[in-house]
A protein has these predicted regions:
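Class I SAM-dependent methyltransferase Rossmann-like catalytic core
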Residues: 1-21
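Short N-terminal micro-motifs specific to bacterial/archaeal maturation
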Residues: 3, 67, 72, 87-90, ...
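N-terminal short leaders/motifs
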Residues: 8-11, 85-90, 125-129
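Conserved SAM-binding loop
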Residues: 25-123, 136-139
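S-adenosyl-L-methionine-dependent methyltransferase catalytic module, highlighting the catalytic core
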Residues: 94-244, 254
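Low-complexity, charge- and small-residue-enriched intrinsically disordered regions
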Residues: 248-261
């Protein structure tokens, strides 16, 4: 795990989680498997104030629970977890929106989730690499599963040059599970989550970097001889627009000079 991801979850913990001495917060880490002796979030939730459980689709270091169905965690009761965290996992998840629906289901009313996922970076399969998360990703995803998005941002510059992982342009989001006062609305919410989970399919087979067919083959043959951007019918309208923009700018500048006199 890169240090900037670790520090984002640490900041989430310090900003949002203030358990009282008599309350133990349950923490579920989705995608917790430690690859090649990587660091994990577990140390952030050690001690008597937290009860940490690492969930992943495969057994291994830092994994406490492997659900029988990767997208339907029947081993985790609904409304049973105070905090769900995840880092460097959602980009590998072929159906991340289903997993987010499960996050919403297992959270207690008012429970919190913090997820770190990249907005850039190279292909890295564990065993898949499906997605990147841009600034509009989390508002759309949280709205889909009924979570209240509290904050989100994609990292555009290093917060500290000593940290590793800036090249992933991580996107951190913090969201809260809804608290219902109307039983009908609550029932509809959980029914919708169940319907989303029911759309899951079998885990796909990992693909190759390129699966070439007739369209890509034809493109490869043509790309050195045809460039739509330099064809006259594509370029001329752009030239006209640029000329008009420059002429307008000159007119505005002349008007400003005239008024200043």
């Amino acid at each position: 795990m890169h240090t900037s991801s670790f520090e984002k979850i640490r900041a989430f913990r310090d900003a949002y989680l203030e358990p009282s001495p008599n309350v133990v917060l349950s923490v579920l880490d989705v995608g917790s498997l430690a690859h090649e002796e990587q660091d994990t979030y577990r140390p952030l939730f050690a001690g008597v104030r937290y009860s940490y459980t690492g969930l992943d689709i495969a057994e291994g270091p830092n994994v406490d629970l492997v659900p029988r169905d990767a997208f339907d965690w029947r081993e985790v009761p609904s409304r049973s977890v105070d905090v769900v965290i995840s880092g460097q996992a959602f980009e590998h998840n072929p159906y991340f929106w289903i997993t987010l629906a499960e996050v919403a289901r297992v959270l207690v009313p008012g429970g919190l989730t913090a997820i770190v996922a990249p907005g850039g970076g190279a292909v890295h399969r564990y065993p898949f690499d499906c997605w990147r998360f841009y600034p509009d990703a989390w508002p759309a995803a949280c709205g889909y599963v009924g979570l209240e998005l509290l904050e989100h941002a994609m990292e555009q510059r290093p917060a500290d040059p000593r940290m590793t992982g800036f090249d992933w342009h991580d996107n951190l989001m913090v969201a809260r599970a809804p608290v219902f006062t109307d039983g009908t609305e609550e029932e509809a919410h959980y029914a919708r989550l169940a319907a989303i989970v029911a759309t899951r399919a079998a885990m796909p087979v990992s693909g190759t970097d390129v699966r070439t067919g007739p369209a890509l083959s034809l493109y490869e043959q043509r790309r050195t001889t045809i460039c739509p951007e330099v064809r006259p019918e594509a370029v001329n309208p752009t030239k006209d627009w640029m000329r008009a923009m420059v002429a307008d700018a000159r007119t505005r500048a002349a008007s400003v000079v005239h008024r200043s006199r």
